[in-house]
Amino acid sequence: MSLQYRGRHFLNSLDFAPAELRTLVEVALRMKRGAERGHLPGRILALLFFNASVRTRVSCETAMARLGGNAIALTPGRDTWNFEDRDGVVMDQNAQEHVRELSPVVTSMVDAVGIRKCDLITVGDAKTAVTESYAELKKDSFIHAFARFSKKPVLNLESNAAHPLQHLADMATLVEKLGEPRGKKYVLSWAWHPKSLPVATPHSQMLAAADLGM
């Protein structure tokens, strides 16, 4: 694997050229076929899940275990303090720790951090408690603040604007099933839903197809 990826954050697939993403996909598929093996002995991935997760959490923990590393999953506000990412605010509400101090401390003890924080996810019967405009939400201020103060790579496990791991997974599936997807048609459809739903996954799915020339 080229050193061009080493130390880089993976916050949005748009930060990488399509050719770079395709290289990652090809390596992943070779590893899946057993033709190439990766090794992460002694490496630790911290996972901060502000939102519930099944597939992303299981895949991250499984990947680290199979590659010889370990994953530590935490739920902020339950397993940890609540965090603040805005500068210049009085922390007299429910946040006990600022990301400015949190990020460098956590990343001094682990090798990478994965973060899922999507304010557009609706849970149960509750309506989405969103007060900011989408123009503000899509800035993904927390994950970018964490990355800014981090000593190690930060991975976006789904935010308001992007789900780059989904992007890679969809690219891998399209290559695996279609061979060479370039020039083929990709249709994304969905049904009406009574609640507000996140847009990161469909955004990443469309970008995955576009990056493959579909």
What residues fall within each predicted segment?
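Secondary-structure boundary motif
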Residues: 30-33, 37, 148, 176-180
